[in-house]
Structure formats: structure tokens, C-alpha cells
Amino acid sequence: MQELKGIGASAGIAIAKAYRLEEPDLTVEKKNISDSEAEVSRFDEAIARSKEELEKIKEHALKELGQDKADIFSAHLLVLSDPELLNPVKEKISTDSVNAEFALKETSSMFVTMFESMDNEYMKERAADIRDVTKRVTGHLLGVEIPNPSMISEEVIIVAEDLTPSDTAQLNREFVKGFTTDIGGRTSHSAIMARSLEIPAVVGTKAATGTIQNGVTVIVDGINGDVIIDPSAETVKEYEEKHNAYLAQKAEWAKLVNEPTVSKDGHHVELAANIGTPDDVKGVLENGGEAVGLYRTEFLYMGRDQLPTEDEQFDAYKTVLERMEGKSVVVRTLDIGGDKELPYLQLPKEMNPFLGYRAIRLCLEEQEIFRTQLRALLRASTYGNLKIMFPMIATVNEFKEAKAILLEEKEKLVKAGQAVSDDIEVGMMVEIPSTAVIADQFAKEVDFFSIGTNDLIQYTMAADRMNERVSYLYQPYNPAILRLITLVIEAAHKEGKWVGMCGEMAGDEIAIPILLGLGLDEFSMSATSILPARTQISKLSKQEAESFKEKILSMSTTEEVVAFVKETFK
Amino acid sequence: MQELKGIGASAGIAIAKAYRLEEPDLTVEKKNISDSEAEVSRFDEAIARSKEELEKIKEHALKELGQDKADIFSAHLLVLSDPELLNPVKEKISTDSVNAEFALKETSSMFVTMFESMDNEYMKERAADIRDVTKRVTGHLLGVEIPNPSMISEEVIIVAEDLTPSDTAQLNREFVKGFTTDIGGRTSHSAIMARSLEIPAVVGTKAATGTIQNGVTVIVDGINGDVIIDPSAETVKEYEEKHNAYLAQKAEWAKLVNEPTVSKDGHHVELAANIGTPDDVKGVLENGGEAVGLYRTEFLYMGRDQLPTEDEQFDAYKTVLERMEGKSVVVRTLDIGGDKELPYLQLPKEMNPFLGYRAIRLCLEEQEIFRTQLRALLRASTYGNLKIMFPMIATVNEFKEAKAILLEEKEKLVKAGQAVSDDIEVGMMVEIPSTAVIADQFAKEVDFFSIGTNDLIQYTMAADRMNERVSYLYQPYNPAILRLITLVIEAAHKEGKWVGMCGEMAGDEIAIPILLGLGLDEFSMSATSILPARTQISKLSKQEAESFKEKILSMSTTEEVVAFVKETFK
């Protein structure tokens, strides 16, 4: 028996035989060719057959996984008809009189390196697409069979270095019980697909393909990120029980889909979801989300080479508001800069982007971008229950200035006969420490706060949460963070305003009892965390949690808080 | 009459005729030469004559400005005998058979670009030295007279693009009443020299040489950074009065050199100085400093290619402690990373260095560097009144761990028979917001706090203080900052501990009344700010300042606080 540690990318436990998805040997040698015309048509032939295959996979994905997953293969089909990729390959074949495999390899690796060097998640995913498409076309050129997971006809756990989008799209849930890969993380394609398919998955093990042989029994625990190879009968039994317990828990969660979130002693809080695109609303409703607590609008601006138009934005906001059917939607205005770059804005390189010219700072300076977004929101406001919040506010004057611009645009629209809702709540993110310290001053100006704990923790501890060397300082349970959260909640309630939280902490099982006791009104998290959180809260007493408030706030370290919460709220 | 705006680099007002320090025309053309041997000896000849001149300037600087200013010319003399510069020039003359001027120009500009590309203040100064030396040698090669400010024999104000170290070293205070340059800032050579010579100076005007003609009357106001060209009689009179008022004020300040710092109602606080090298102690004592509130030890590590030895550090700490003659010296342990890089440590490039692996984070990880510094400090402790503080502490555990390492090293030294003082106070910098928010927890562990407001403001407002685009958020008077400072002072005093401040805010005339009212015990600032601060405090009543505490802390913006303080403490 052997154990591997990886990243739990999709919850659940699977036990089955290992099926190694062998990377086909696609080693390409440079060969000189005489008839380049014949070689170019051989290349075209391979492109055509790849397109055929992708059309079939896209169909399968649409049926099994829904539109946005199928869209990935539309992107692949676009790559296959992109002259920017194909022409240089053909030119290379003719000018250098080299074989098509080599010309393709050279051209595509140039694109992959370029995209991967861009410090931007979206462009890295484009690199994965190009690598995936190149593999498929090269397979046809070399006459090498590309493994086709959809052909699997017995219960298996897939073992691979990484799963390309087309691999994961072909996974047939009936037989593929789970998978484990060497590389990848929670946000890579394979992980996102596993969660949609609800197939347990552990990624980033670094050693799956090196250790697991074909046919050997494997256990994949996607909750804790463990992979057990050739387990003893006893271990298999233990994990079967865990699997059943997980299924029971999932069933328990499912019962609460349409229930409100109420503590044991009758206190109601709102569980909302964080979303990035209109397509995410489906997941919110399926998981019993009572609202959207954070709509990150920057996705509308990313992965393109110019700003989205007012109408494009209007359509997106309108769709989300309509799909949420009157449930509240809190939209965060543009938060780019920091680690979210928009190449087409050509913002200057900064030594410390997280402490730089981003979000509301940029919007108050380059107002046309800001006003376009606000107009689109105001126009969409009549299609649902819209709330607007500004990110990265540091001073009271910044909030006042941003709100004044909103009201100015509203006035212009109303004058021009445009219908605009009259009860749009306007609030702000509390993610900069100064706003928590004098929350009483901000509470007079806002309709609500939403605490962005990811950044609030980062600035309060002066530690970049993306920097592994200082990640030990990213401490959500540090008493300093809990005291700042308390300041914000008390200040808001004193002015009759509500407080939500949209950082990862809001869905964290250790934080939830504390936050309930501190009086948080709304918890906004990733959709899949909502039902577990609702179940947890239903077993907690708000009064009991509140009774521990002073004790927790007077502790001096994270370790003390965690130990106390685990002990008290077992 | 015309006005220019620049940076007030050295206080005081000067009125005199303009003396343009013309940059000699040193344009160099590439010429092919036949006899390279003769050309090399022509080059050697020019080097020799430059050395002679520099020896004379060094002597003059030693007499007029003291050792550390003279050291600059030792550095220049070193450059003139540095084979790494000279050999490539001679090789270029022989291999490319080009004239010495061209060979020198090519080689030195390569070095200048390399040094200037290093994001490090010290290396940029090295670039200025090489440019200065190259100018001198090229002058000799071209037979062009380099202007020699020491030849000036009437009262003048020097007007130049920039003043090289050798220019400023030759300034004869008897005639040179002040100067103004196009480029440079508060920390450039010329500014530092002007302050030592106490010659009024305005740098960074961008337009001095472009606007001011030789012989025209010029007023230089080094306090406000203003330059007035061809002033009316009335303006001259106005500035003469300002000049006399400034001299009177300086005389008033001078009376308090050896006086304690006491408010109008008898409350004593300690005014200390921030220093970077042992040579700075002279300025501390000359300006009536009661202690060193911050000894930045990173200068010992910079501008070299390996770590300083334990003995090198011991010598530096011992010298400072001895020169301070029993007055307290608060030494900050190593604070590198962020904008202070040590190339020889090869630390990984970080996306946000100010939120990264720096200071105590690095020292707790790479303990040998930390332990070496602590041993040097402990050994020096018997030579004066040493206090030690750790920078960039974020959690209580970090402080406990750092203090445990100090006590471990102390135990080892004592066991080995080394004398170590028994009353070394151990404290910490409060510059990370978390430590201010739960200052009551830290106050149980430390002997004192020193509030590092430069970084505290930066993290609390999430705005990089070196980034011009967000500099408006660097707000020392923001009520959030003042409330954090209050938390720290109240927490410390409750535990019977003292609180100092070593950010720029401590010497700021708007902040001083507020800080006095909040109960700050020690104000540590640049030496030249001490006497003005002592004078200001002597006219303030602590009780009166304290009575405004609640009012100020309940304000919502910086602007409100500044207006109130200006109005109340006129």
C-alpha cells in the first residue's frame, strides 16, 4: 500500500482499478522534404480530421456537461481555423522544406511559451488549449492513436500526467469513477470539469503516473486530496464507509436546497454565492443560494483586446438579474490591476501591484471606463434586485466621489427617459484596513458593507497571499482580523445597515461559528460550499456562539482561536 | 520676474547673482588612430592629472566638510585605479585603434547603465561617481577646462544641471550662498552635501539652466523649494526679512541644543534621531538629540558583495554606543527585502516585495544571518545603552521566536565568558496593521514599541508610498492611522511600557501636537528636525492637546484633521 498527497480538486471518494491514460509517443523529428505542396495538403488533411473529432467531442460535452464546457471545444475549433497559427506552419513547411509535424511543433511551442509568460490565468488556459490541439493534429500526422477516454467500458480511476480539456469532456460518468493527475491545481480545466461532473479528483500529486500501474486498485479521496495505491482490504472498507458517509451528508445537504438558513435558536442569515459569469447563476440556484453576494465583473474585461461595450455589459448584468428572479445581486464594479492585468489598458508596471493603481483608484481617475459600467448597471437595474458595491475603497472621500458619479449618471439616464430602479443599494467592499478601523465613519455613508477578507487579511498582515514564502501569515483566524471584522459589524448595525462577507472565510467551517457569533448578516461563498454551510449553521446556536465573542477576541494567536473553536463547536 | 518650483533640499534663503556652472562641451567623436601605444600613454597621462586634482579636492573636502564627505573622493580615486574600468579602455584603444576619449566614453557608459539599472539607491550613487570621474578625465583628454567652483571669489548662487560630488566638495561657503539644479532629489549627493554645508539649495527644478542667465539676481528658498529669477526690489526685501526670520529661528533653536524637551505644562518627551551609519552620530549630538530612536542596520549590508562579518558589525555597533555616551540607542535588526535588495543573497523576485519575504520573516528562516547580527549586538551591549527592536513583526509568535533566539545567543556568549549587558530592552516596530489592532497582546511581551508610520500608513491604506499614482493615499493624518496609534499607546501604557515613533510623521509639525496629545513618549526623526520640534513642543500644552483627542479621533477625513490642527495650534 502506498499513499500520495495532492490537491483535493473535486469532493467525494472513488475506489476502482487504475486506467493509465498514457501520453502517446508523439516525439517529432525534423525531416527534410522535397515536395512541400504534398506536405501542406497532408497537414490540411490532419487539420480536417481533427476538426471532425472535435465536433463529436463538443456534441458529447454539450449533452453531458452543458454549454460552457462545450464552448471550450468551440475555442479549440477556432484554434484549428486560426490563420495566425496555420499560415506560419504552412510557410515553414514551404520555406524550410521541413515535415509538417516539425513545423507545427515549432510554431505552436512559440505560441505556448508566449501565452504562458503572460502573468494572467486566462492566457495560461489558452496555452493549454493550443497544446491540446497540437497533440491531436500531431497524432493524425504521425498516425498515432490518441487515447480516447470515452471508449472506457468498465469502472476505472484515470491516472494521467494532466487531463486536457478534450480528455475530461469525454469522461463517461458511468465508468469513470474518479481521476488523479501529476500536475494542475483547483482552478485548472480538469479540476473545474471534475466538479461539474461531480467526479472525485485529486490533482497535483506530482507522482501519480510514476507510481500507479495499470489495473491496480486505487482510492481517490477528493475531499482531503489523498490517493491510496493497492490498499489493504481493511483500508478499502474504511474508505467505503467514508464514501457512504459522504453520500449521506450530500443527501442531508440536498434536503436544505430550498430551505432558508436558520440557526438552532431561530436566527436567520443569508447564504449567497460569488460568481464570475452569468453562466454561474445555474450553480447558485442548484446549490440553494439565497442571493449573489459578489458578482466579479472583471471577467467581462478579460481575455479580449478591448474594453467591453456598454451594451455587452448591460446584457450580462440583465441576464444575471433575471436569472436570479428577484433575489439580491451584489455587483462589484471593476477591480482590475493587482494580479488582474488588462494588456490593452497598458497600465505601467508597478513594483507592488497589490498596493498600486487598481480598482476604484483607476476608475476615479479614468472615469469613462467607470461611467460606462455604471450606466450599464443602472439600465439593467429594472430587471431584478440590484445592489452595487465599490472595491478597494480606502477613504471616505473616495466612496463619496464614486457614489456622486453613480448618481450623476443616473440623473442623466432618467432625464433621457431611461427607466432606472429607485432602490439600488450602494455599498462598499471592506478590504483595506483603514476602512475597518474607522468603519463607524463609513457606516454613515453606505447602505451595506461586504468584507473582502482575502485582501483584508493580506493587507492587515502585510503578506502577499500568492507568495508561498509568506503564506503562513495568511491567517483568517488571527485575533487582529476578527477584531477588525467586529468593528465593521458593530459600526454597521449601529447605523441600521447590514454586513456581508465575500472572502473565502465566509464559507470556512472554522470561521462560520465565529462569524455567526459576531453577528454577520450575509455569508457569500462559492456555490458548492452553500449547502454544507447551511447544514453547519442549522446545528449552531447564535446565542451560544455570541457568548464566546469576548473570549475569542481577547486571544493573542491564530492557534489559540482554532483550538478553541474546534473544541467548543465539535 | 520668474518663478521655478523645485525640491527644498537644504533649508535657508539665499539672494545673490547667478553663476552658471556650464557643463563644459565634452562631446567626443570617434577617431581612428594609428599609434595606439601613444594613445594609451596619453590616457594614462590624463588619469594621472585627474588623480592629482582629486587629491587636492579631497584635502579641501576633509578640511571643509569632514571625513565622510572626503571619503567620496577616495571612492573616485579608487575608480581611477580600478583595472575593471581602465583595462577595458586600454584594450579598446589597442584592439579597435580608436581615440582614448571614445574608448573611455563607451566603457564608462556601459558601467553607468548597468549600475543605474540596479533598483538600489547605493548603486545609483556609484553611477554618479563614474560619470563624474569620466568627465574629469575626458576634460584632460580634450584639453577642456573643467569649471572649478572653488575659484569663485564673489557672492554667487550656483545654477547647474546637476552638481557632481566634486563640484559640491569645492563649494567655498564664504562666496557660494546657495545653489539650484535641474535634476536630483532630497537624497542625491548634492542635496546631502548642501545640508552638511548648510547652504540653501533647491534641486529638481527641471528648468534652472534653461531659464537663469549668468549674473542675474536669483533668490533660492530652500525651505519651500522656490527659485525666483530677477526679483523686484520689493520681493528681494520680502525675502531678506524671511531670511532674517529664518536666522532668528535657527538661533532660537540653537539655544535648546542641550535642553530637555518639555511642553509648556512641564510634560517631558524624548526627541531622538534616525541614523544609518556611525558617522551620523555627530549630527545627532550637534542637533541636541537625546537618543538614537532608530539605527537602520541594513546600510552595513548594502553596497558590498557579501554579508558583513560579526566583527565588522560589532565595531559599528560599539562605535555608535560609545559616541552616544550612555544615551539610549535603539538598533533595528536587519530589514532587507522590499525596496532594499542585497544582490548577493539572490532572493527570488517577488510580485509584491513590500508584502513579501523580508526583514524578520527572512531572519527567522535564514537564522545564521540573524544570529550573527544578534551576537555582534550582544557583544557591543556593554559599551553603552543598547535597545534592540525587530522589524516587520506581524504575529505574537514571531516576536516570541525572535526574542527566544536572542536569549539563546546571549546564553551561549555568557557561557563562553563573554560580558553581555543584563538590561537590554527588547521591543518591536509596529508597522504592520495587525500588531496595532491587537497591541494589547503584544504589550505583554515587549519592553517597548516604536511605531514605523511610513510602512504602517502604507499597509493600512494599501498604497505603495513609492508609487506616485497612489501617493494621495499616503495620509499620516487619516483618522484610521491616528486611531491605530492610539491603540498602541494605550496598550503599552496599560502594561507600563513606553512607545516611540520613528516614521517621518514623528518630526512633522502638523502631527506633533496630535501625537503629544495621544501620549507618545519618544519622537525619533532626522537629526535636523530635532531643534524645530523641541521649539514647537516647548510652546504646546500637553493637557490642551490631550483635550482634543476624542474630537480628532472621531473625524472622518485627513482634510478635517489638518484643518482643525492648523486652526487650533496656530
Curated annotation (Swiss-Prot), chains A, B:
Gene for this chain? ptsI
Q: Which NCBIfam families match?
A: PTS_I_fam
Q: What is this protein identified as? A: Phosphoenolpyruvate-protein phosphotransferase
Binding residue positions for phosphoenolpyruvate: R296, R332, N454, D455, R465
Q: Share the domain note from the entry.
A: The N-terminal domain contains the HPr binding site, the central domain the pyrophosphate/phosphate carrier histidine, and the C-terminal domain the pyruvate binding site.
Instruction: Give the multimer and partner information.
Output: Homodimer. Interacts with FloT.
Task: List cellular component terms (GO).
Answer: cytoplasm; membrane raft
Family to which this protein belongs: Belongs to the PEP-utilizing enzyme family.
Positions contributing to Mg(2+) binding: E431, D455
User: What's a BP term from Gene Ontology annotated to this protein?
Assistant: phosphoenolpyruvate-dependent sugar phosphotransferase system
To which species is this protein native?
A: Bacillus subtilis (strain 168)
What does the UniProt keyword field contain? Cytoplasm, Kinase, Magnesium, Membrane, Metal-binding, Phosphotransferase system, Sugar transport, Transferase, Transport
List cofactor names only.
Mg(2+)
The record's misc note reads: The reaction takes place in three steps, mediated by a phosphocarrier histidine residue located on the surface of the central domain. The two first partial reactions are catalyzed at an active site located on the N-terminal domain, and the third partial reaction is catalyzed at an active site located on the C-terminal domain. For catalytic turnover, the central domain swivels from the concave surface of the N-terminal domain to that of the C-terminal domain.
Q: Name one GO molecular function term.
A: kinase activity
Q: What does this protein do?
A: General (non sugar-specific) component of the phosphoenolpyruvate-dependent sugar phosphotransferase system (sugar PTS). This major carbohydrate active-transport system catalyzes the phosphorylation of incoming sugar substrates concomitantly with their translocation across the cell membrane. Enzyme I transfers the phosphoryl group from phosphoenolpyruvate (PEP) to the phosphoryl carrier protein (HPr).
What taxonomic lineage is listed for the species of origin? Bacteria, Bacillati, Bacillota, Bacilli, Bacillales
Q: Which PANTHER family match?
A: PHOSPHOENOLPYRUVATE-PROTEIN PHOSPHOTRANSFERASE (PTHR46244:SF3)
Q: What is its EC number?
A: 2.7.3.9
Location relative to the cell = Cytoplasm; Membrane raft
- What is the active site of this protein? H189, C502
The UniProt catalytic activity note for this protein reads: L-histidyl-[protein] + phosphoenolpyruvate = N(pros)-phospho-L-histidyl-[protein] + pyruvate
